[in-house]
A protein has these predicted regions:
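Short, Lys/Arg-enriched N-terminal segments with co-localized hydrophobic residues
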Residues: 1-2
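Conserved N-terminal segment of class I S-adenosyl-L-methionine
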Residues: 6-11, 15-17, 26, 34, ...
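Short, contiguous strand/loop micro-motifs
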Residues: 113, 134-136, 211-212, 261-263
Length: 308
């Protein structure tokens, strides 16, 4: 009876996925057409990713159907239940249009993140403390939530993930974060709120604030840091793009169009001295650079630690 029930449940899950396939293919086609009309290199890359995810989804559905195709062999196959769970979970992952972070969901399934800060090794690169026991953590611009879940795993008693631009985007959305949180059985909280709307009254004050890959997207970076300072109780970890490394005084490059990575949402590339000055003007102290990567010409990525 138990074996039959398990098979029925899994078969129903497969049928549910198959019913969604037609709608998913339509959504894939609509999104692809919209991105192709945009015609930018960034959009072209997204089209390539969408195509890969669509192929993966079709492949997983086919593999799962084949798994149940021979009734006489199903009992033996059920002995390897994690393989079935992996197939079903992979199918869910493939339904998410765009993944930014690589998140280990278990069962051998890792989300296909394409972001520059998307691998587990970056926990060390940003200097995330080994233990966050008893601490509260705010992850600003969380996207898929990789760092939010990492903070939770390190013992944080409360983690709040916030985002607005990505989560409210019709082409990306919040699905990746919600899927990862459900599968990981995470208690991470979430709030859709813009950086410039952060305040102690709206979100509270946190021992540790993560501002990773966000600052250069801000049209008003100084105001953004003021808002971040207001909700920082102890420490800020800031990761950002920097430019004008050849300038020996505080300076920042301004990107009025698509100069940086052909992305119109990138606005400023301050050099390290400018970042330090901006953090100090917001009220932070004891500011230091803890990591530099992807250096190219006058540009790089840098991680700063600062305290209140």
């Amino acid at each position: 009876m138990m074996m039959t029930t398990t098979i029925e449940i899994l078969w129903q899950q497969l049928n549910d996925i198959k019913k969604q396939a037609a709608d998913l293919n339509l959504r894939f086609s609509q999104a692809t057409q919209k991105l192709q009309e945009d015609g930018t290199p960034f959009s072209e890359n997204l089209v390539k990713e969408l195509t890969i995810y669509r192929q993966d989804f079709d492949k997983i559905c086919t593999e799962t159907q084949q798994f149940f195709s021979s009734p006489q062999t199903v009992p033996a196959k059920i002995a390897s239940l994690p393989d079935i769970e992996r197939l079903l979970l992979t199918a869910e992952v493939a339904k998410i249009p765009v993944w930014h972070h690589c998140i280990d969901l278990g069962c051998g399934v890792i989300t296909p993140g394409g972001g520059k800060t998307s691998s587990p090794q970056t926990e060390q690169k940003i200097g995330l403390p080994e233990s966050l026991a008893g601490m509260t953590v705010l992850d600003v611009g969380a996207w898929d939530g990789f760092y939010s879940f990492a903070a939770e795993k390190r013992g944080a008693k409360r983690v709040l993930a916030t985002d607005s631009f990505v989560w409210q985007s019709p082409d990306v959305g919040k699905g990746g974060f919600e899927l990862a949180r459900r599968v990981l059985k995470s208690q991470v909280e979430d709030m859709e709120i813009d950086v410039l709307d952060l305040s102690p009254e709206k979100v509270g004050v946190f021992d540790l604030v993560l501002l990773l890959g966000v600052l250069y997207h801000m049209r008003h970076p100084l105001l953004a840091l003021d808002r971040v300072f207001s909700v920082t109780g102890k420490q800020l970890i800031l990761e950002t793009h920097v430019d004008m490394l050849d300038c020996q005084r505080p300076a920042a490059a301004f990107y009025s169009g698509r100069e940086l990575n052909n992305d119109p949402t990138n606005w400023f590339g301050p050099n390290p001295l400018a970042v330090k000055g901006m953090l100090e003007s917001a009220g932070f102290r004891d500011i230091k650079v803890v990591n530099t990567s992807q250096a190219s010409g006058t540009c790089a990525r840098m991680v700063f630690h600062a305290w209140r």
